[in-house]
Amino acid sequence: MTKTRKLYYEDAHICAFPADITAVAVLSEGPENAPEACLAVELDRTAFFPEGGGQTSDTGTMKITGGAYRGRVFRVVDVQETDGRILHYLAADEKDAAKGLAAGNRVSCALDWDVRFAKMQNHTAEHIVSGIVHTKYGFENVGFHVSVTRRDSGDADLTGEVTFDFSGELTAEQLRAVEREANAAVRAAMRVTASFPAPEELQNLTYRSKLELTENVRLVTIGDLDVCACCAPHVANTAEIGIIKLLRTERYKGGVRIHMKAGVLAQNDYGDRIALTELVSRFLSCPAEDIPAGLEQLKAADDRAHERRVALEKALADARALFLAASAEDGRPAVLFESLLGEDAVRRIVNETVPAAGASLVAVFFAPNEDGTAWRYVIGSASGDLRPFAKELNAALSGRGGGSPGMIQGTVGASQDAIESFFCRLSG
């Protein structure tokens, strides 16, 4: 079996290339990452990077360049390397999925270059940050993932982020220092190179690595800043990254997880934050620099409004309880329909009314849906067991609920008229 030539190691900036097909397989189902795939194709050469090293695979297109099916285009939706074989998973019409694809045929391939380049920017940025953290604080990078996607299908605007984990915790001030140094490395336009040292040479080199590797080790070197074992494509110069921004952190397995965006992802994120700032500024009717003070004022006003609302709800609940108690007579049910108060206030009404209602049943229906065909209820009584009544109520009014002998609660799927009719029949 001839191995696929890995163009992404020869030049990470190759975004389109011709290739010859070496094998085609029709799939009964696609891989986990790309269930829509129905074909797996091997090429004599490829610039599509397969998933690995914490980075998702490249995607793009594969176009037939000759024969009866010349010009037919397939979507490359996933790329995986298994047992030394690089499989390109394609999406196509299953009725004629493999037509035009056969060993020996030539295809023209193109990467989703903007997505690939964003991954390169962010992966190299991760090496820069990890190298600085390792040098300054001695912590190891123990986990890494980068993912880049389009916001919407066909949209040129990219989103995504990098997460990476360190073996120790970092303070906010330390992270700010790391970010400043990382962006200084970007501005320094350091050369980024990759090599495969011989095993005997590797023994004498100092480099970062998550695994104990002894052969086919690819080292990515960033100026005099960092050397790390890595299988992924990188930018050729740190200046290609543009900017590195550490967004937030969280404690993770005794260390810290960092969320980062670099390059075009950071640029898009900055644009989003500017738009959000402008939106909040308009909402608060204040310039951006006054947003913190505006939010403080809004919070204070909301707190005052909440206090007033609580006081008004209490007063309204007390008034409703008095009304309900007055309507309870001759053992007939006292029923109230309430659309303003919530569950806590309704329970308060029932609890306050039951002692004054004597043998009468006290029922409050509240929180109706938009068309008034469903209600919640709380029903209490100082005499008898309400649980058999709950079954009768639920059966008659398409309800659900239950509770204790002295109080039941639940929902009914009925209108106010239907509920009133039920209680009229109940009282005779």
PLM region spans:
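A glycine- and charged-residue-rich anion-binding loop/surface
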Residues: M1-G428
